[in-house]
């Protein structure tokens, strides 16, 4: 997967998703929002409808897959049940696993590290953070929970 994408599912935390998009675009990064549905409209955890740049089918059709660079990024905002909806979408989780295996970068916010990234098969020794109370999903997979706002590993 080439590029930077932030994936949206119903119940996402709007501030985590759209503030991230805003800051990245201001910084010159061409980030695209992707609805995991056939429709571009996704509803936030506070019932605010948002129009994504593309629906999941458009993402699959327009994105080149293959060897990744660290600059190829998949971003998962938090929010509940948004994070659970992302994690339940098998096609996206398959792409995440492939992307991670090929050396692409994964970024997750708030609940998403525990709910989404914990689905990766090997977190042994990875330093990770998440929303308070969600640590167990990471530590049971061998990750080291770090109580910090931002962690890079």
Where are these regions (language model features)?
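A cross-family phosphate/adenosyl-ligand binding-site feature
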Residues: 44-53
